[in-house]
A protein has these predicted regions:
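N-terminal membrane-anchoring/stem segments of glycan-assembly enzymes
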Residues: 1-33, 170, 182
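Cell-envelope/extracellular polymer assembly enzymes that use nucleotide-activated donors
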Residues: 35-38, 66
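Short, well-formed alpha-helical segments that are part of the catalytic scaffolds
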Residues: 22-27, 46-59
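Membrane-embedded multi-pass helical conduit in multi-pass membrane proteins
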Residues: 277-352
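Long helical/loop segments within the catalytic core of UDP-sugar-dependent glycosyltransferases
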Residues: 11, 93-116, 143-210, 259, ...
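Acidic donor-binding/catalytic loop of UDP-sugar-dependent glycosyltransferases
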Residues: 77, 128-143
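Acidic donor-binding segment of Leloir-type glycosyltransferases
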Residues: 54-101
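Catalytic donor/gating beta->alpha subdomain of glycosyltransferases that bind UDP-sugars
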Residues: 144, 151-176, 206-209, 214-276, ...
Length: 371
């Protein structure tokens, strides 16, 4: 058993090393050839985040033809923020909100309304808490053209301020890039190798309309990677690249926000309950058990296994600019991750669904319910 764990831990270290060395980042724009881009921002109670987001978009230059914001029935001052910025720049438009239709999640419905109103060659969907770097839009357009893509997602840099952000948020990249073979996705088009981050999705408008876009994944809570899989399944070329140079995001700002945010996505991310429990068992056995067993045995293979896991964390921390001290908290972070998964599963199994921004969703969304 211990030897098997050691082999698996070393193999996963190899995958992480391949990602660090072979997974490409979005390149800075060099041609100066502008595109025609609609920046599409779904916003629900984003009064706090939206000003910085819009400021960053307005610095992008002439490639941005229009900036559309969908105020999804916010109860704060989101609409007033959009109106203030609209008076500064006529490219900004507020897309009128419609009642959420049965069978849709709120974000998917908002994105579909934004896409229906967009008029540019390219659609760039970004979250309201995302911050585009200078010339980010030009860089994305250039990647779309140079790589002949119809779908591009950027994995953003993570802004982390509080203790719990720095301790827990790096687990997102650890979970993904310790098992996802990023370099393989460049050369193989199978949908299983699709990956996306919902904070930054770019597609050309033509393929979006032909495929159906968010309407095809209307009930999905984990819609970003589902969209990436859909594009590949329909014969389009899509990639996810390291986007730290072009976009950053502060996803959550407290332990409570982290818990509720990942509780929303955790169990729904899996196609079946079997795959969910396989993931949970794998993470408990490979990434947590070696540290627990070291408390009762001094087997040298366990020390190497634990060292391989921490080395994986260190590699990814260096690539994604995470605080190195958080690596030492790996057993705690891994335990919280597993508790999050069980919590997400339990809510869905008991029919409570997952609450997010005043709505409650079930694994396959029906009509949302107000909290």
């Amino acid at each position: 058993m211990i030897l098997s764990l050691l082999i698996v831990a070393l193999a996963l270290l190899g995958i992480a090393l391949a990602n660090v060395l072979g997974w490409p980042a979005v390149r800075q724009a060099t041609t100066g050839r502008p595109g025609s881009v609609s920046v599409l921002i779904p916003a629900r109670n984003e009064e706090r985040h939206l000003p910085a987001c819009l400021d960053a978009v307005l610095r992008q230059g002439e490639s941005v033809r229009e900036i559309l914001v969908y105020d999804d029935h916010s109860s704060d001052g989101t609409g007033a923020v959009v109106e203030f910025y609209r008076q500064r720049d006529p490219r900004i438009r507020l897309v009128p909100a419609r009642p959420l239709e049965p069978g849709w999640t709120g974000k998917n419905f908002a994105c579909a309304q934004l896409a229906a109103a967009a008029q540019s060659e390219y659609f760039l969907f970004i979250d309201a808490d995302a911050r585009l770097r200078d010339r980010a839009v030009d860089s994305l357009v250039e990647e779309m053209r140079c790589r002949n893509l119809q779908f591009l997602s950027c994995w953003p840099g993570l802004e982390m301020v509080t203790f719990w952000e720095q301790a827990l948020m790096p687990m997102l990249n650890f979970v993904v890039f310790s098992i996802f073979p990023g370099p393989m996705s460049l050369y193989m088009s199978h949908p299983s190798l699709a990956l996306a981050h919902g904070a930054c999705l770019m597609t050309d408008g033509r393929s979006y309309r032909e495929i159906g876009g968010h309407s095809v994944v209307r009930a999905e809570i984990f819609e970003d990677t589902r969209l990436a899989q859909l594009w590949r399944a329909r014969g389009r070329r899509g990639l996810c690249l390291d986007g730290q140079r072009v976009i950053r995001v502060r996803m959550y700002s407290s332990f409570d926000e982290i818990w509720r945010g990942f509780q929303k996505n955790f169990f729904p991310a899996f196609k079946s309950e079997i795959s969910f429990w396989a993931f949970m068992f794998f993470h408990a056995l490979v990434f947590l058990a070696p540290f627990l067993w070291l408390g009762v045995t001094n087997d040298w293979r366990l020390w190497i296994c634990a060292g391989a896991i921490l080395s994986t964390r260190l590699l990814l921390a260096a690539r994604f600019h995470h605080p190195l001290w958080a690596v030492l908290l790996h057993p705690l972070s891994q335990s919280i991750l597993l508790a999050l998964g069980i919590s997400s599963w339990w809510r869905c199994k008991r029919g409570h669904g997952v609450a997010w921004k005043g709505r409650e969703y079930h694994k396959k969304a029906a009509a949302p319910q107000r909290d």
